[in-house]
Amino acid sequence: MQFERFKLVDRILEINTAERTIRCEAIVPTESSILDHHFPGHPLMPGVLMLESMAQTSGWMILGVQGFRKMPFLAAAREAKFRTFVEPGTKLEMSAKMVHDGSGFALTQAQGTHDGKVVCDATITFRVVDFPKPEFKQQMLKFAEELHFPMQMVAND
């Protein structure tokens, strides 16, 4: 993870467009100015960043299902739960499943686990729209390659 770049997923482990699922790896940095202040002397990953990591994981899955034709933007998060503390250096496995896709919206169930135990989960809604600018899509494709996104899923429109 790179908090300062707002990159909260390190690597895509598996994406299955038929089942509309994804698994990603996210390693909490051992050093970050954010962790220096959350909390001083007892650094913990902020819950809002756990939620963002679940949202980014879901977003990559939606991009795969859409073949990078449309971009998901976070619209709502419901029933977000943070079940335990997440410390610097923790390796998280983030996962998501799309449970609805239609009318310009997608809904996912997402969670983060560590050593097989759920540390966070949420129901997340996205507005799914055309990319606002071609440059933005190109930047997202560049990020996708960095994360080992299976580029064969990108539609050749």
Each language-model region and where it sits:
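Short aromatic-glycine motifs in intrinsically disordered, low-complexity regions
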Residues: 1-3, 67
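Compact, glycine-rich, soluble single-domain proteins
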Residues: 39-46, 51-59, 74-75
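Hydrophobic core residues within well-ordered beta-strands of beta-rich domains
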Residues: 6-8, 92, 106
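Hydrophobic beta-strand-centered segment that forms part of the acyl-chain substrate-binding groove
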Residues: 57-93, 119-123, 127-129
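A structural signal for short, well-ordered beta-strand segments
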Residues: 12, 24-26, 77-78, 96, ...
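Catalytic strand-loop segment that frames the active site of acyl-thioester-processing enzymes
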Residues: 4-45
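A residue-level detector for short acidic-glycine micro-motifs
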Residues: 11-16, 79, 84, 98-100
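HotDog/MaoC-like acyl-thioester-processing domains
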Residues: 21, 88, 99-157
